[in-house]
Amino acid sequence: MSAAGPTPPVRLASRATGALCAGTVAAYAAMYVTQPLLPMLSAEFGLPPATAGLSVSAVVLAIAVGSFLAGPLSDALGRKAVMVGSLALLVLPTLACAMARSFPELVALRAAQGLLIPGVTAVAVAWAGDHYAPGRLRTAVGAVIAASVAGGLLGRVASGLVAEHAGWRAAFLLSAAVTAAGAIGMGLELPRGGTPGAPWRGALGGMLRHLRDRRLLGGFALAFCLFFAFIAVFTYLPYRLAAPPFRLSTDAIASAYLVYVAGIAVSPVAGRLATRVAPERLMLAGLAISALGVAVTLAGSLALLVAGLLVLVVGMFTAQALGPSYVNETAREAKGGANALYLAFYYLGGTLGSWLPGLAWQRWGWAGVAGTSLLALGAAALAVVFLCRPEGALRHAQGA
């Protein structure tokens, strides 16, 4: 337990976890609002796919940058203050996106969103670490990861459905309303707790020391490669579904993201399994399942493509449900900074994953996108095997 105090009563913990999850849903919904809209943005602004993808890359890169600041800020100022303040401020650029007059203006506003989103995404797990005993932490983190999946699902599906009938600007208005509701819920229901105990410079120094820890570096590498692989598939999926032989409409493309529902189900299960099975083994299992899903998407059938996406989601969120709690438990100090670094590497991977595969798409089509995703998953598996395992287990494996 941290200095935040004892674990809250069950009723309070339930309400607080609900508010934490609601804020997480709002933050992730804002992050992914443009993903199903890329063909629509390409048509309106006359952009090739890789350029339209900057509306995703900009927010993801800004999240990576913002994550470096959010963790130490939460260590110094308090988790609740950073989360509620960030989510409240996020309403402003989200509303402004609905009024953007050019694509560069939209990209700049998306970057502003990205700087604020880590105030929730990079701090939520650290807040859970302050308020839950170790035996309950992985389950709580699983709930937060499930909320992130729900937010991604809401952002993608709702924005596509709204845009099809009311235009892409209306999707940002909906996102702003969801964000405001999340900020209010967090402000009312989260106990303050976890009073700041480290000055800014001390918190930043603690975060930087994590970069010398082999096992934490393994967790950061896993985060980078995992999200690269995942966002590569889902960023360029709309182009594949809009092209022959499928030729799907924007709302039909958005409905393909309903496979995210599987992530909502699997994340808490993976968190509970990690209390009985070594997290490193479950991470590898998740990566293997993800690779299988990506391979299946290469089939020419729409049904098999959707099945592959479903398998990919199950594998991705099996591994992702374990990564943040692994980092939180491995870090010996500045846990907010450790979680922030995990998110920073995660979104740096997402930045490259939302842009680089666009070049592969232009040259090799979907096979190029799937190939880059599979390479990233292989690199993630190597990081788990050689960096994440405890020292004794690693020596045993090398001796064998």
Which residues does each predicted region cover?
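Juxtamembrane intracellular "pre-TM" segments in multi-pass secondary transporters
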Residues: 3-11, 190-220
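Helix-to-loop junctions at the C-terminal end of transmembrane segments
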Residues: 67-78, 265-278, 361
